[in-house]
């Protein structure tokens, strides 16, 4: 029976569908009796499992950079090529990282379900099929329907549990972070290719005080500069680039940025 379940699950995971009742029941039973065997399946077929979502990721990325390219064309009269295989590969690698995460302190069945729903939600948002909130609620409902209400994390070095979040909080962070990081990576590539120096950071109501200090402003990408008599602060310094806790693109950050040209309507 165990061998049959392993064979069945391997096939379903490679096909990218492990959400039906039989799959979840098999995952639960195997995670209780043979968690190492199940983990071995995930690892040995990681490339194939990832490949099942690669096309969806590729299609999503090809549609996600329309605003950046439009701004470049309007501001510089330059029409850049659409997203390349290199950028697509970078984001597919990001999705693979989700599958490979090791700091989720849950039985394998719960971990697999959480990662599956996270990837599904990210794909829905990137393809424009759903808004972030709608995708979030759908993913949360599916997980709660499977009895998963809490997501636990552990320190990968000590093995100790570090924090426990409600599933809606955890999956919201997971979805937003992945989408934002993909978007920022692509934006940086476009700005570099076009030689753009100035960027405008978005703003939104309810921003945390530390983010309100730098949101909605225009910055220079390469140090403090004076352009056409206007002083611009360094973007990465002002917006705390790379600060996971409190910088742009960090945890729970909803800010984005894009090309800016003097005189452009803000």
Feature locations, PLM:
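N-terminal leader/targeting and assembly helices and adjacent pre-domain segments
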Residues: 1-148, 263-266
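Generic ordered-secondary-structure signal
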Residues: 1-6, 23, 30, 160-163, ...
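Arginine residue identity/basic-tract feature
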Residues: 12, 22, 63, 71, ...
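General structural signal for secondary-structure boundaries
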Residues: 34, 49-53, 130-135, 162, ...
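A charged, amphipathic alpha-helical module
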Residues: 124-170, 174, 185-189, 193-194
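Acidic, glycine-rich two-metal-ion catalytic cores of nucleic acid-processing enzymes
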Residues: 150, 165-263
